[in-house]
Design a protein with these regions (language model features):
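Catalytic core of soluble alpha/beta enzymes
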Residues: 4-6, 13-192, 197-216
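C-terminal extensions of enzymes
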Residues: 213-228
Length: 228
């Protein structure tokens, strides 16, 4: 299908998914890189690896232990090569201000050391106000804009545009537990505002969400062409 961003596994358990020293996720990223290189039909196909870790990296290294977390992110960067890596929710500091400070601190450490891994704000970044707060403080490199949490398409649009204005990555996300209609509405918002990426939804089987979202994109383009 040539998806621009690879769907991620659920890295939501230290013992079973991340590994006590992060070894399981590292092995998974290496496997994913090797598999894409083996199966792709075109060497120019370079998808982004976007992996939500549900705060587990902070759980093993410490939510504000930036040097240790950055060391591990550098290992993941190497494992993902030649593909670009995004890590969503590296830590969960259990309250909004501390989460912002931790993501800001980790971004500064990663950027200072030239580690080519993007950090995506997830935990404690839910409402339009939250998105602006994280973007203003450069807490991470990108925000997941959780479409159901924002309360209206006006807020979804404003959140994406605000992130772009601030030079902060905009990931128009949401949840797999949505409907085909909400996904179609979100696609229209995304086609208008141009976030960096959009979640293929609903469902966790990949194909159904990808088809619903991609078909709506094609429908918008076809209608636009017909009206010219």
């Amino acid at each position: 299908k040539g998806a621009a961003v690879m769907p991620h596994a659920l890295i939501n358990n230290v013992k079973l998914k991340l590994g006590e020293k992060g070894e399981l996720l590292k092995e998974y990223v290496q496997w994913l890189s090797q598999r894409v290189q083996k199966l792709r039909n075109d060497e120019n196909y370079m998808p982004v690896f976007h992996i939500d870790v549900y705060g587990t990296i902070g759980a093993i290294f410490g939510v504000d232990n930036y040097p240790a977390m950055a060391d591990y992110l550098a290992e993941l960067e190497e494992a993902a090569k030649p593909f670009h890596l995004r890590i969503e929710g590296p830590m969960d500091a259990e309250e909004r201000e501390k989460q912002m400070l931790c993501l800001k601190g980790l971004r500064e450490e990663v950027d200072r050391r030239g580690i080519n891994v993007e950090l995506v704000a997830d935990e404690w970044c839910n409402t339009l106000e939250d998105v602006k707060y994280f973007a203003d403080n450069k807490a991470g490199h990108m925000a997941q804009i959780k479409t159901p949490d924002l309360g209206g398409i006006n807020n979804i649009v404003e959140a994406v545009l605000y992130c772009k204005e601030k030079g902060f990555g905009a990931y128009q996300g949401g949840t797999c537990n949505e409907t085909d209609r909400s996904a179609q509405v979100c696609v229209n918002c995304a086609m208008a505002t141009k976030p960096d990426q959009i979640l293929a939804k609903p469902g966790m089987g990949v194909d159904e969400g990808y088809m619903i979202v991609y078909n709506e994109m094609e429908r918008i383009l076809a209608l636009r062409k017909a009206r010219k």
